Amino acid sequence: MQAELQTALFQAFDTLNLQRVKTFSVPPVTLCGLGALGACGQEAQARGVSHLFVMVDSFLHQAGMTAPLARSLAMKGVAMTVWPCPPGEPCITDVCAAVAQLREAACDGVVAFGGGSVLDAAKAVALLVTNPDQTLSAMTEHSTLRPRLPLIAVPTTAGTGSETTNVTVIIDAVSGRKQVLAHASLMPDVAILDAAVTEGVPPNVTAMTGIDALTHAIEAYSALNATPFTDSLAIGAIAMIGKSLPKAVGYGHDLAARENMLLASCMAGMAFSSAGLGLCHAMAHQPGAALHIPHGQANAMLLPTVMGFNRMVCRERFSQIGRALTNKKSDDRDAIAAVCELIAEVGQSKRLADAGAKPEHYSAWAQAALEDICLRSNPRTATQAQIIDLYAAAG
């Protein structure tokens, strides 16, 4: 009896200890530098892919931006079927249509070429096509799944960091809510960071996606699951964004600034993929889906307000964020001021009301935010009433 009790106690302690274990994961291969896109064919060939399903932003496809990708694949004898993704954030209906087309074309690998919406859609497609008995709504981070198709991610904006995360965000066609799924299988095999493909991104999109990357880095640095690995990536990303985002917005042909933003976005993605995000993302998903607000813009509307809410438990961390953004000694209030200044400098100082938000929306949004997976790692507990107040403050 005593031995059995001792075994049970040890098992209980082991379980508790495992709950405290934190993980850190990144894509197996990340290529960066001007011309890196030219390596796509080689990376596909190395993974035994003979026919790639190329999911591409419809505007980029019409503009002929996939030509370098096509040349790279042709040089290695890899066939391609192009799927122009509809504009806007991905909906499960669009994902299912892409899965059907991939099967019909008999492709054995996926390339995502576009912004975060395209990358998120491609990750879902690569996973669902090999798991036909599964649905995204039923999947969790602990689901046992068949291996997805080989996946190469080529971001054409610097913001989501989706090329280096185990997360995808898809809009549910019935509820209209954003579904956030985290699973190890969603991590791409290869991330290709080539600043040349971001050179033509308009200033407003550059600004919105850049603030999204900043939000990722700040929330990862503040997250409950932060580690020394994620801290180094997040604080480094914050410093790079503070220096490079205004340059990339002000002069889009500054390829050094563009490359720094791609790297910072990737670093922030690596950080939050392991550390988690927080209340800003949990709140931003709700008006973003309901009012079709671009994700980076929704984050810009809410980030300073949420930082003010979290400040009481993040004073030291926020001081480091302020130092990274301003390159001088800062306190927690300085960090929030520096974030507000950067948001204003790149033209993203808007309020929720500017996008059509009304006070009667706040209660339902707050309840949905409480159910959002991103809230798990927020450093301060929030109630529905507090979240309603935060929406009102940002309104």
UniProtKB/Swiss-Prot annotation:
Disulfide bonds: none annotated. Its EC number is 1.1.1.1. Induction: Part of the 17-gene eut operon transcribed from a single promoter, induced by ethanolamine and adenosylcobalamin (AdoCbl, vitamin B12). Its main location: other. PROSITE patterns: ADH_IRON_1, ADH_IRON_2. Fe cation binds at D212, H216, H281, H295. Probably acts on the acetaldehyde produced by the degradation of ethanolamine, producing ethanol. Expression of the eut operon allows this bacteria to use ethanolamine (EA) as a carbon, nitrogen and energy source. It relies on cobalamin (vitamin B12) both as a cofactor for the ethanolamine ammonia-lyase (EAL) activity and to induce the operon. EA enhances bacterial survival in macrophages in a concentration-dependent manner, suggesting it is an important nutrient during infection. Belongs to the iron-containing alcohol dehydrogenase family. This is Probable alcohol dehydrogenase EutG. It comes from Salmonella typhimurium (strain LT2 / SGSC1412 / ATCC 700720).
